Structure formats: C-alpha cells, structure tokens
Design a protein with these regions (language model features):
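Extreme N-terminal leader/targeting segments of oxidoreductases
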Residues: 1-18, 33-37
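Short hydrophobic core segments
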Residues: 20-21, 253-263
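Dinucleotide-binding Rossmann-like beta1-alpha1 core, especially the glycine-rich loop
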Residues: 59-178
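Central beta-strand plus flanking loop segment that forms part of the substrate or channel wall
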Residues: 277-295
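A conserved short coil-to-beta-strand element within the FAD-binding core of flavoproteins
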Residues: 225-239
Length: 295
C-alpha cells in the first residue's frame, strides 16, 4: 500500500489491536509474528525502517561462541540454530563467514575456563590445591586445547538435522608453518591457528525492509508506516497521538496493546506514553571500521 493511502486509512480507522513503536529488528519480528497470527497490527517508526541500532551493528550473525565459557549452553544452542535458519531462509543477505583464531600456546586458560564454566571462578585452584598463578597476559589467552574443545562443543548444534541446507563447514586447525604460509602477516609467536565459521549479514537494513514488505503482502491486517513519531497520550490515556514527520499531520490511535520496541530510546518513549521508566544504563558499544584490503 502507498504511504498516503496508509495515512488516509489511519485517519479513518483509529482502533487497532496492537501498536508497535519502533521498526528495528525486534519491532519487525513482533510485527511479523502477530501478522502471521492474523492479529491486526500497526508498526510505526520516527525514521526509516531499521535505521537505528539494528543498522549500526557489526553485521555478524554469530552463534554466541563466547558464551560457552559461562556455561550458557541453551543460549548458544538457540543462537546457532537461529543463525542456521537465517542462512537457509535469507541466503541472498546472510553468508558464511570464516573466522581465524591465532593460538599462541596449547595449555593457557584450561583451569580458568573450566572453573568459569562450572561456576567456580572464585576458587581457581589446581588439582594440587594450590591457587593458580597466571603469567602475564595469560588471563586473556585461550590455549589450543580450550579452543579445540570449545569449537567441538560449538558445532554440536550445527547438525544437518537442524537446518540441512545451511550446515556450516567444520572448523580446522593449522600448525605454525601452514598458518604463516597462508597468513604471513601473523605474529611468528603463534603455534597454530583455528578457523571456524559463523555468518555475516551484508545489509541488515535490506533484510529488515524485506521482512516488512513481505509481511504486509501476506496479511491485510498488517500496516507499517515510517516517519511517524509518538507525541504522547490524549486525555483519555487510551489514545496514542502520532505525528507525521513529513506532512505535520497528527493521528489518534486507540490500541488494545502497545509494544515499545524503540531500543535505547525506550525510556524516552515510555515517558511520552505517561509511563516513566529508567531501564537504559550508561553502556555503549563501539565498532571500528578499517579500510584494509588484506582483511
């Protein structure tokens, strides 16, 4: 439906079962799930679809391998399976990504990782009962034994019975000579390298927009409109006021349920809705983009 037609319909039909505020990947996922269950749903965003946090990601679709150290097996399993589903369902956007781990020794981190895995990181005792001493930098290294065990465990859920068409290649180890021959820029201090596969999404915003347009085609009860921001609540406290950033027109919507999917703006949105919260802390993630042809 053309945007002007959507706005015209919105001015005539103010009631909707679910209003989703925020069209990042979480808002879009909720939008799609509700629409496929034949729920009438309206999703709005103050800017372009997927223009916030969802577009400013590392573009990785990874299985959460680092969570193995904490023993979060259920989380890793879910992440690997969802990664494989994306590889199968969106191969035009999601591709396998070979990832190389340089290994500088074979034994570092065995007891530390084992203690962390079993929730005993406060003890860190060796079998002899002596507290383990760490050499300089050892706390940040994972030896070859740990990397091998971790990758084997990681691939337990990469079974063809889960997503046959999207099974990833198995990991492999290369010793020092072969590694330096293939990657001569690596430090000569390595003893080996490990190569495993995760996935990368080349254009997360395109994948998101495709999900929106396909959902609207599949369900007549699903409407998604961008450049429509939340102003506040009407006096009735059951009516949400929306503002068209293009024309300046305002709309009053009466949803039975509101889903706030505005990510880091969630507290600001809740304040406008008359429900002040303080969910967002002061953490921030940063990504470095390097222009390096060899990478």
């Amino acid at each position: 439906m053309i945007r002007q037609d959507q706005l015209r319909y919105l001015s005539q039909q103010s009631k909707v079962s679910v209003l989703i505020i925020g069209a990042g990947i979480n808002g879009i996922a909720a939008f799609r799930d509700l629409a496929l269950q034949n729920v009438d749903v309206l999703m709005v965003d103050k800017g372009d679809f997927c223009s916030g946090t969802s577009s400013a990601s590392s573009h990785m679709i990874h299985g959460g391998i680092r969570y193995l150290e904490n023993g979060e097996l259920r989380l890793v399993r879910e992440a690997v399976q969802e990664r494989n589903r994306l590889l199968q369902l969106a191969p035009h956007y999601v591709k396998p990504l070979p990832t190389m781990i340089p290994i500088f020794n074979w034994q570092s981190g065995i007891w530390k990782i084992a203690a962390k895995f079993f929730g005993l990181s406060g003890l860190l005792l060796s079998p002899t009962g002596l507290r383990l001493a760490q050499s300089k930098g050892e706390g940040h290294q994972r030896g070859g034994v740990i990397v091998k065990l971790g990758l084997m465990l990681y691939e337990l859920w990469n079974s063809p019975s889960i997503v046959t068409a999207a099974r990833m290649p198995s990991h492999r180890f290369q010793l020092k000579v072969s590694s330096l021959k293939q990657f001569p820029e690596l430090s000569s201090d390595i003893v080996a390298t490990a190569i495993y596969y995760d996935a990368v999404v080349l254009s997360p915003e395109r994948l998101a927009v495709e999900l929106v347009t396909e959902t609207e085609k599949m369900s007549q009860n699903a409407t998604a409109i961008n450049y429509l921001s939340v102003v506040g609540m009407a006096d009735s406290q059951r009516t949400v006021i929306l503002h068209d950033e293009v024309s300046g027109q305002q709309f009053q919507i009466q949803p039975e349920l509101v889903i706030n999917a505005t990510g880091p703006w969630i507290d600001l949105t809740n304040r406008k809705l008359g429900q002040p919260t303080d969910f967002i802390g002061g953490s921030k993630g940063s990504h470095l983009v390097l222009d390096h042809p060899k990478l």
